[in-house]
């Protein structure tokens, strides 16, 4: 599934609460997360930042890139399950959707390493994540987006996915 040009602008709007790059302190992030919440991170920087704050995402989706430049992969020695998929920029592949769905039934923490680009994988994550999970991803040049999975969020991302089909 490819991202049509007319959807690009829509996806620039955060799906959830935006924590500004100028205000990335631990309290602002932690107060949005309860201890028993399933936490999913999409993006190398987001994953790395959460690990540095002492948070352990149950699912981490990374691609070894930041703003399309090679970067060091975040270190996490607690990973129990490693998965991988191929997902070209501007697309959501069937393979990546299946791997994301599978990740929710694997022993956590799960790390999915994407060959390609992980940015759009926030969409299938929001569809498959358990109710009330927290999904975090970076909003380029703005900050961190924190999404709580609700029926409304699922409906919103499903519409986006339907348009991409």
Explain the meaning of each model-derived region.
Residues 40-48, 115-122, 141-142:
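Gly/Ser/Thr-rich loops at beta-strand to alpha-helix junctions
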Residues 51-59, 75-77, 126-131, 150-154, ...:
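Short, solvent-exposed amphipathic alpha-helical segments in soluble enzyme
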Residues 57-64, 131-139:
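Short hydrophobic/aromatic-enriched beta-strand-loop microsegments
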Residues 80-89, 156-165:
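A polyampholytic, Gly/Pro-enriched intrinsically disordered region
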Residues 82-114, 120:
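Internal catalytic-core helix/loop-beta-alpha segment
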Residues 107-137:
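Hydrophobic/aromatic-rich, well-ordered segments within soluble, folded domains that form packed cores
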